[in-house]
Amino acid sequence: MQFTALAEQPVVAVGFGLTVLLFVGDLAALGYWARKEAAARDRSVVRTLWYLLTGVGAVHYAFVRFIRRDPGSRDAPPGPRERLAAAYTVAVVLAFLAGAVVSPPDPVTQVLAFPPLFAVAFAAMALLVTREPLAEESNAPT
């Protein structure tokens, strides 16, 4: 598909633009998340960034840190911005994987499906990383 065809099909152009913006935002959120995590653990930002750049590393870390609530060796608990940056990064990975499974193998369709899939994944991840852990909920008196 040529770039001149994007001007003829505004829906594809908007979908392509949103997808590019989401991926650029993911890089910014990933950098912020890596910097905050490395500072809280007194570790190298580069090593943390490389770990989080792998999709498996980001999903694993978000699960351990925010869903299981494993405190690890941090100086302070993660703040709300760090939690949302993690949710954004993991939502991009999940939306990409869901798009590969759900949408047809046509690249244009996958680009058009990415923004709505991201919105759903981000909402789900934001709810997961901002809620209280399940262990505390089960200890609450009834």
Question: What do the predicted segments below correspond to?
Answer:
Residues 47-70, 107-110:
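Hydrophobic, aromatic-rich membrane-embedded alpha-helical segments
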Residues 22-30, 124:
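Hydrophobic alpha-helical membrane-associated segments
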Residues 27-35, 60, 94:
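Alpha-helical transmembrane segments of polytopic integral membrane proteins
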Residues 14-25, 115:
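Hydrophobic alpha-helical transmembrane segments of multi-pass membrane proteins
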Residues 1-15, 39-42, 70-83, 127-142:
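Haloarchaeal acidic low-complexity proteome signature biased toward cell-envelope/secretome components but also
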Residues 97-111:
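Membrane-helix boundary connector in multi-pass membrane proteins
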Residues 117-126:
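Alpha-helical transmembrane segments and their membrane-interface exit regions
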Residues 43-57, 84-97:
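Alpha-helical membrane-anchoring segments
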